[in-house]
């Protein structure tokens, strides 16, 4: 299988999100990279499902709560930016303050 660098990046985000989701299901509080992976994956999948950029941004803010991550993580994650492929092309989606206190 020959993947482009962009496809490899998407695959790594997916894999990291799967690991993070399994840990979250076990009740483990997520660290910074795990939180970023879950939020990024949710945005990428929203775009793939045909959602608008605004909808994808909103979905990114609903993925995690402060109770699901380590104490310092919400303050560390003030912005998540991810390139996602929408029906009308690839766009940079910015999710501000994605982890609500």
From Swiss-Prot:
Keyword Membrane part of the UniProt annotation: no
InterPro entries named among the record's database cross-references: Urease_gamma (IPR012010), Urease_gamma/gamma-beta_su (IPR002026), Urease_gamma_sf (IPR036463), Urease_subunit (IPR050069)
Keyword Cytoplasm: yes
Pfam families: Urease_gamma
Pathway terms, separated by semicolons: Nitrogen metabolism; urea degradation; CO(2) and NH(3) from urea (urease route): step 1/1
Catalytic activity reported: urea + 2 H2O + H(+) = hydrogencarbonate + 2 NH4(+)
Compartment(s): Cytoplasm
Signal sequence segment: none
Keyword line: Cytoplasm, Hydrolase
Coiled coil: none
MF annotations from Gene Ontology: nickel cation binding; urease activity
Major subcellular site: cytoplasm
Biological processes annotated in GO: urea catabolic process
A Gene Ontology term for the protein's cellular component: cytoplasm
EC number annotated for this UniProt entry: 3.5.1.5
Family: Belongs to the urease gamma subunit family.
Subunit comment: Heterotrimer of UreA (gamma), UreB (beta) and UreC (alpha) subunits. Three heterotrimers associate to form the active enzyme.
Protein's name according to its UniProt entry: Urease subunit gamma
Encoding gene, per UniProt annotation: ureA
């Amino acid at each position: 299988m020959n993947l482009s660098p962009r496809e490899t990046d998407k695959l790594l985000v997916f894999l990291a999100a799967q690991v993070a989701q399994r840990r979250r299901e076990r009740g483990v509080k997520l660290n910074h990279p795990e939180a970023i992976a879950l939020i990024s994956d949710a945005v990428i999948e929203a775009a793939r499902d045909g959602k608008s950029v605004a909808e994808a941004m909103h979905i990114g803010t609903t993925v995690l709560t402060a109770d699901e991550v380590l104490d310092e993580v919400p303050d560390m994650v003030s912005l998540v930016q991810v390139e996602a492929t929408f029906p009308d092309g690839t766009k940079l989606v910015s999710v501000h303050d994605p982890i609500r206190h």
